A protein has these predicted regions:
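Bacterial N-terminal signal peptides
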Residues: 11-21
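Bacterial N-terminal signal peptides that target proteins for export
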Residues: 1-12
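Glycan-processing catalytic domains of CAZymes
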Residues: 26-258
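Short, flexible coil/linker segments at or flanking structured domains
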Residues: 7-8, 21, 111, 192
């Protein structure tokens, strides 16, 4: 029932108007982790994120039902409160179908997250287009996010994106510039503007990373490429975000290290 991150967004350039650049953020790297497993009391994923919150700055993507669902799920409510109490930042998941999903439905999901789970103060926008025809669509999402009380939008085209798409007049934006298996990460080349911007403007998620040595390589490359929000996992398949990475403790320490 969950909708998972995709990589087929078109790459036509477009420009946002009235752009602002968020103020530079701290140098420490952070983790952006999709929590696409049901929050049972014994969930290794949820327990691991909770317990690692003292080690690394974590933003967890929350996805109860391909979005917020229509009513409070008591297990999500309890676990979200638990993570919030530990200082984990919480981003609500909405999908946009690369600009084809009705805008009213996206905005409604954003409002529902704030109503059902008020600790969710960040927004994760999946299946983000970078087609010029969708400019007003995403500008409306940014404006609505600010009005609804969100503090930041994480946009996920999952690939290199025209720079104009990575800022907003309404709200700070972080863009996922790489979200794919390990095979493409070593040779990946970020757009030139990435190195000149605050690292907090960018995120990456690398899946199918089978060893701790490759995890360390991925994290170090992300930092070298000026990417602040980092996630690496051994997981793969239709949902590569439903298990705690096998090298979890080492990964959290690696991301948090200067």
């Amino acid at each position: 029932m969950f909708r998972f991150l995709r990589h087929s967004a078109p790459c036509a350039a477009f420009a946002l108007t009235c752009l602002i650049t968020p103020a530079p953020e701290a140098d420490a790297a952070r983790m952006l982790i999709p929590m696409y497993a049901y929050p049972t009391a014994g969930s290794a994923l949820w327990n691991g994120v909770r317990d690692a919150s003292a080690t690394v700055d974590i933003t967890a993507i929350i996805n109860p039902a391909n979005g917020p669902g229509t009513s409070v799920d008591a297990n999500y409510q309890r676990r979200i409160a638990e993570l919030d109490a530990r200082g984990v930042k919480l981003a609500g998941y909405v999908y946009t179908g690369y600009g084809t999903r009705p805008l009213a439905d996206v905005l409604a999901d954003m409002d529902t997250f704030r109503a059902l789970y008020p600790q969710v103060t960040l927004l994760f926008v999946d299946e983000q287009s970078n087609d010029v025809a969708t400019l007003e669509y995403y500008a409306a999402i940014h404006a609505h996010a600010a009005a609804a009380g969100y503090a930041r939008v994480f946009g996920n085209p999952g690939t290199n994106t025209p720079e104009a798409f990575t800022t907003s007049a309404s709200i700070p934006v972080t863009t996922v510039i790489y979200e794919s298996p390990y095979s493409g990460w070593p040779a990946y080349a970020a757009d030139s503007y990435v190195g000149a911007r605050p690292a907090g403007d960018f995120a990456m998620m690398v899946t199918n990373v089978g060893t701790a040595a490759r995890m360390r390589e991925c994290v170090d490359l992300a930092k070298a490429r000026n990417v602040d929000y980092i996630y690496v996992t051994h997981d793969k398949g239709a949902n590569p975000y439903d298990a705690l990475p096998t090298y979890w403790s080492e990964e959290t320490a690696r991301i948090a290290a200067p």
